[in-house]
Amino acid sequence: MKAKFYICNHCGNLVTTIHNAGVPLVCCGEKMKELVPNTVEASGEKHLPVAELSGSRLTVTVGAVEHTMADVHYIQWIFVETENGGQIRYLNPGQAPSTVFELGSEKPVAVYAYCNLHGLWMTKL
């Protein structure tokens, strides 16, 4: 199942689904908006995840030019989608915009990064 992410336009809640039953996701009394990766007008070189697979270890860095990690502008999380599911890592201001995923026998399909100002970014693998 392809990963999909949704946001509440009122409170900012972000969710993903484990099973999509086909009914709209609702928050604050309104339908949540699906986030479409790579559609915000911003620098791709600072937002697109860069992934390097070495054996079962996937290293992901956000941006060919490293993304800032300031209190007001940073990457909140990185998600790796695999053939059988996925893993997420949460980041904080001041940390490097990178993480390592141990995938075991899982095959990575795509990596996503979420910028608090410029939204969702994705690189297919």
What residue spans do the PLM features occupy?
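Residues immediately within or flanking Cys/His clusters that coordinate Zn2+
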Residues: 5, 24, 112
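Short cysteine-rich clusters marking metal-coordination/redox-active sites
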Residues: 8-11, 27, 115
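Short amphipathic, basic-aromatic surface patches that mediate peripheral association
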Residues: 62-70
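Short Cys/His-rich "knuckle" micro-motifs
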Residues: 17-21, 35-38, 123-125
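Short acidic/polar inter-strand loop motif in beta-rich domains
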Residues: 116-124
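Short, aromatic- and glycine-rich surface loops/edge beta-strands on solvent-exposed regions
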Residues: 107-117
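Short strand-edge motifs at loop-to-beta-strand transitions and within beta-strands
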Residues: 97-101
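Cysteine-rich micro-motifs
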Residues: 21-31
